[in-house]
């Protein structure tokens, strides 16, 4: 009888483990569709083979691994991200989207992923800075739907600055090089690695002082109703920060602290 009971206990344990396997596998095959605009190296950009790579992508892939899901990267224009999220064409936005009060009225955000300063880029020797007074009458390019556009419209336009919005950041750079605009406002890292460190950016540099957009850093945008997904991603981010994985990923791209306070 004793051996029979032991066998029953072992059998019950094995059956319990077997029953757990489909649940794990189901979680592992779950797909999270991240919307991204691959025009922001080193955050996200198209590789020669057509795949999307960058800091955001590496962070997203690690998050998916930790929540036992598979990432699917959906290429979208930045200005169309929130509408696509509401239309359920994507599950989340991971594309250097700053956490702002205006956006928080429409969607939820995860905890912060990173936080960078913003700068003005112009041709070397430009006789203006990043303050509204010196920019009066100038044409400044920004990406449509970005926090840079919001800042420029509220802080500069009332003082006579002409703000030109573009669908993509590469279009901003193209018009800057061709002289159609006098300057561009964007994130420091995207400006430095995506333009100034490239051949077409050799005649340009930062002008004026760094600017604060009033945001709370960059997070992952999620529908407000997706409470469970947000909680699981927040837990993944916290564990990445705690075990050093976040720092290891960041060091692939940057030599400075990307997270901030």
Predicted regions and their residues:
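Bacterial N-terminal signal peptides
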Residues: 9-19
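A ligand-binding cleft/hinge motif common to bilobed small-molecule-binding domains
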Residues: 79-83, 95-106, 151-154, 182-214
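Extracytoplasmic small-molecule ligand-binding "clamshell" domains
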Residues: 26-96, 105, 243, 252, ...
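Ligand-binding clefts/hinges and TM-proximal coupling segments of bilobed small-molecule sensing domains
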Residues: 70, 147-164, 202-206, 235-261
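Periplasmic-binding protein-like
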Residues: 38, 114-122, 188, 196-238, ...
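Alpha-to-beta junction loops
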Residues: 68-70, 86-95, 139, 177-190
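Bilobed "Venus flytrap"/periplasmic-binding protein-like clamshell domains
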Residues: 33, 38-41, 52-65, 98, ...
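Extended ligand-binding regions for polar small-molecule ligands
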Residues: 57-66, 126, 133-134, 138-139, ...
